[in-house]
């Protein structure tokens, strides 16, 4: 009986609400800032292709997904706008990344070198975004405190590798969705770390 009930449930997604939210966010970030919509995990259960089509129609600049499979699904669904893979992609998949016009996040020099080697091997150029660790302590080039100089140098070296086109830099805020002055101050500090390193590189 429980299975029958579960099969009859669904989520109804209001694309007008998505449009409203997009416009509010766009107003807050301003015209000079690019908008990237994260649609990983089937747009968090909202339907990745439908949400992506709406964001593309509204003028979003970029989409982000977790994996190559998710990126390919969007391409097969007719999505043509730039897509960034936030998660790891095995280096041997670089030819697919290039042929599908997918951008890959790079979180360490070793990964940048692997992607560079594979891109050169297939005679292409892989677009990448550099991930900076500003406090999440999950993935990314270390640039805080004593790691500043070595981190910035590593990012600059990764950006200069043949076969790679470093078109962006990003971070993952550790506590951006938590309330309170302490958390807000920490998020602002993380943002400052990322933008300071970007200006140096």
Identify the meaning behind each predicted range.
Residues 5, 9-12, 17-20, 33-192, ...:
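Active-site-proximal beta-alpha core segment in soluble small-molecule metabolic enzymes
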Residues 196-198:
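Short, compositionally biased segments
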């Amino acid at each position: 009986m429980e299975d029958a009930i579960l099969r009859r449930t669904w989520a109804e997604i209001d694309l007008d609400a998505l449009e409203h939210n997009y416009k509010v966010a766009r107003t807050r970030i301003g015209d000079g800032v690019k908008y990237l919509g994260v649609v990983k995990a089937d747009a968090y259960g909202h339907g990745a292709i439908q949400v992506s089509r709406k964001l593309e129609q509204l003028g979003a600049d970029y989409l982000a997904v977790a994996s190559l499979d998710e990126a390919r699904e969007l391409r097969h669904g007719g999505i043509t706008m730039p897509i960034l893979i936030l998660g790891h992609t095995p280096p041997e998949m670089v030819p697919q990344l290039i042929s599908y016009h997918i951008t890959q996040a790079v979180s360490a020099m070793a990964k940048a070198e692997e992607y560079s080697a594979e891109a050169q091997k297939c005679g292409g150029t892989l677009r990448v975004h550099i991930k900076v660790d500003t406090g999440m302590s999950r993935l990314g080039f270390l640039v805080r405190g004593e790691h500043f100089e070595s981190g910035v140098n590593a990012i600059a070296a990764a950006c200069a590798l043949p076969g790679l086109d470093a078109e962006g830099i990003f971070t993952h805020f550790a506590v951006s969705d938590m309330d309170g002055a302490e958390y807000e101050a920490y998020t602002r500090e993380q943002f400052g770390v990322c933008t300071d390193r970007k200006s140096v590189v």
